[in-house]
Amino acid sequence: MHIHAFSPLEVWQGAATLGLPVEDFLRRLKAVGLDTLPGTAAEILDDEVRAIICPDKVDTAQWLEVIETAHRVGFTTTATIMFGHVDTPRHWARHLIRIRDLQRRTGGFTEFVPLPFVHMEAPMGVRGQSRHGPTFREVRLMHAVARLALHPHIRSIQTSWVKLGPEGVKACLEGGANDLGGTLMNESISRAAGTQHGQEMPPAAMEALIRSIDRTPRQRSTAYGGVSEDIHARGMTAAELTPMVLTPPRKRRREADTNQERFEYAE
């Protein structure tokens, strides 16, 4: 089993709670079995934006410090960007440059994952303090520009079916992305923010989606190594998960209630 856990925010807070330097805390995690770290909580690596959207999280320098230290200790990590809220293309460029410069020093990023902001149930979106996410054109450009800006230092640009749905990821795979986000089992974060693309995409569905745009799928490990034919076959024949009963996001519940009221009134 591969353990992929602890964002830079969680590492920073964990080290502070125990009164340890970040490096010592990371070495403890490595000693007890942690394999890789997610490069989440990055949002936008620019403190102009972070002061607005996540003032209670780590700042840009702290995020970069945790990731660089993790790479030095021997971990590989992902890198993300969450865009389309109060940010601008200038902030996106700064973010990409900071990721690229760190990768040049450490080589520890395995992939870059653009994550379009989902506004429907996000606090900023509910309060009307942000955009309603990026445009689809901006989403496609982010994947394409990331490919150009980060090449050859980060070779895998991942697109998220949870955020974009099947048609969205097809478009991104044809314009910059070369990696499709994981199968997952019980995705909850994006759903809580308002997405409705489901909680799981089985391997067979992922391969069919990739083949539909005349690409050849290749399963990989979390660390971007190869996967044996036996493991691949077991994944393709695994039983479906038990269907989950999902509570619709608040906005969808309000819309359903309103539609029901209109229907009853019409009768």
Give the positions of each predicted feature.
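Conserved SAM/AdoMet-binding glycine-rich loop
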Residues: M1-I67, H71-T78, H85, G107, ...
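Short hydrophobic alpha-helical runs that function as membrane-insertion/retention elements
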Residues: P38, T78-T80, D179-T183
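Catalytic cores of alpha/beta
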Residues: L20-L26, V86-R100, K163-G175
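Alpha-helix N-cap and loop-to-helix initiation/capping positions
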Residues: T17-D24, C54-Q62, D87-R94, S130-E138, ...
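Active-site-proximal loop/turn and secondary-structure-junction residues that shape catalytic pockets
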Residues: S7-W12, A41-I44, I81-D87, P116-M120, ...
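Auxiliary Fe-S-binding modules of radical SAM enzymes
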Residues: Q103-E267
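Conserved, mostly hydrophobic/aromatic
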Residues: L37-T40, A70, I99, A146, ...
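Aromatic-anchored, glycine/proline-accented short structural segments
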Residues: A70-P114
